Amino acid sequence: IITIEDAIKKKSFVLKSKTIRRGKSSTVIANSKHRLSGKLECGGQDHFYLEGQIAMTIPQEDNNFLIYSSTQHPSETQQIVAKVLNQKFNSINVKVRRIGGGFGGKETQSFFFAAISSIAAKKLNRPVKLRIDREDDMIMTGKRHQFIFNYEVGFSDNGKIMSSKI
């Protein structure tokens, strides 16, 4: 299985399908004055932020840690690092310098690097900075995956959608 179409034909899905129903969409669409159907495809996408993923953790007094992270979500970085280190949230201080061009790729992708630098800093009891090259960054971080869906919609003369099936 190489393509999404192959997976659909063979009913081989990564996750279990979810079905949300309200009413009898096929009947309503068939009885609608107007009908459209089609297929929507969207290609996959890698986040290509301008600055690669970087995290630096500095041990502080009283088993606290200062983390500099190129993240768009410092509060969640704090929570994840605290959980990984088995510490209270208030023992982790996350600072973010100016970052530009994150395009959403630094919202959740940066946690991994902050956690690794924090584990190493705690173990070594010294500052640890983690900056990986672009190739490894692209391999390690998530993507927006390609998707395809077929749709049918029934609507009235004035454009009111009566029912849809996706």
What is each of the regions a protein language model found here?
Residues 1-166:
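Structural alpha/beta core scaffold segments of enzyme domains
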